[in-house]
Amino acid sequence: MYTTVFYWALMLAGMLSQQPASSSASSASLNFEVFRTKIQPIFLARRPGHARCIACHGSGTPLRLQPLPPGSATWNEEDSRKNFQAVQRVVLPGVPLKSRLLIHPLAEEAGGDFYHNGGKHWSSQNDPEWQALKAWVLGETRTSGD
């Protein structure tokens, strides 16, 4: 019995003493205003040969975005917050290449994976939309181009 207790105490002490995998991952946080002003427009953007993100991610997918209100070109505050919560589930703050939001729609030869039924929206990590997503995942807080 003492051996079992000692074993579990050692395991618990080891888990508590472990450092985070990455200091950037632990220190980065996702900014709602940047999401609202820079990231959400990406979900509405039209790309040749692809459906807009909102077309498929409105229902039936792990990343579910709120439908646009009738006649509206963007989301209201409440729906933006719901989208923010949904998108956080597919992002590892501080680690873009471990964030499904960035790697699923990125071409495999550019560092993406084979998942994403909606096709590969970005052929390069240098794509401006991909760069905006990356900056947000890394903790971008500026909402303007300044």
Report each predicted region and the residues it spans.
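Bacterial N-terminal signal peptides
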Residues: T4-M15
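Aromatic- and Gly/Pro-enriched helix-to-coil junctions and flexible linker segments
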Residues: G14-D146
